[in-house]
């Protein structure tokens, strides 16, 4: 089976392609330079050329604040492009689609984890476009799988974890938001779960693909400092109001994982366990070894 990965140059896309290659899977890895998923003719041509057994859509507009002033651009990539992919795959019933979505489709005012079937009510332009993308995919291709995830970090790309590593190296104290709660999620675990879903063609609909447990940004920053053998007391709690941004951030965006029970697949493990395993690779990517004889 051939896998076609859109957004293959992004943080999640790179990790997914790497793990598929390690498993000796047949992969067509297409970044934006190779496939503009917003162009109908380009999508049709890519599907015809590569003839994938499954498509994983990692392409997304993720500039949450910029979307507030350019919702049309966000909608093009987050809603229209997924629709094009789903419609392109619809005539080929044996071909599957895994589409990545976000916790931002919920309002973020709950006190218990959001179930997969909880009504969506996004409060940001970014969240609205991702909600519209989910609906477009499942309308055009009911056999598709939508995986909602959140708070991603990985060995490459920008993330909160990498930012905390850099801030710790500068020394001194740092103020971190302690009144927003979510689920830090490692791209390695998410990539493994995407592969598992792709190999189980009976898994359809919406699933929540975040690492288990929950944390505030403050909790996550302290854990990063501990893994660096630094004093977590240097991380000071503050409120989200101290960092004013154009787009509202969810105060509570913990996702429930109940639907995994009916799939035969396990949900992702606890976020602390995942972070501990991922950390050496993140540090290695942050400070790659110098080749002998290199200038």
Swiss-Prot record:
Site residues (Could provide a fine-tuning to achieve optimal pKa matching between active site and substrate), renumbered to this chain: 102
Residues that, per the record, bind NADPH: 11-12, 36-37, 60-62, 126, 130
Cleavable signal peptide: none
Cellular component aspect of the GO annotation: cytosol
Cofactor(s), names only, from the UniProt record: Mg(2+)
InterPro entries hit by this protein: dTDP_dehydrorham_reduct (IPR005913), NAD(P)-bd_dom_sf (IPR036291), RmlD-like-bd (IPR029903)
GO process terms (BP): antibiotic biosynthetic process; dTDP-rhamnose biosynthetic process
Metabolic or biological pathway, per its Swiss-Prot or TrEMBL entry: Antibiotic biosynthesis
Disulfide pattern: none
GO molecular function terms noted in the UniProt entry: dTDP-4-dehydrorhamnose reductase activity; metal ion binding
EC number: 1.1.1.-
This protein's UniProt keywords: Antibiotic biosynthesis, Magnesium, Metal-binding, NAD, NADP, Oxidoreductase
Details of cofactor binding: Binds 1 Mg(2+) ion per monomer.
Residues annotated as the enzyme's active site: 126
Chain residues that bind NADH: 10-12, 36-37, 60-62, 126, 130
One Pfam family matching this protein: RmlD_sub_bind
Family: Belongs to the dTDP-4-dehydrorhamnose reductase family.
Described function: Involved in the biosynthesis of one of the two 2,6-deoxysugars, dTDP-L-oleandrose, attached to the macrolactone ring oleandolide to produce the aglycone antibiotic oleandomycin. Probably catalyzes the reduction of dTDP-4-keto-2,6-dideoxy-beta-L-galactose to yield dTDP-L-olivose.
NCBIfam families given in the database record: rmlD
Descriptive protein name: Probable dTDP-4,6-dihydroxy-2-methyloxan-3-one 4-ketoreductase
GN (gene name): oleU
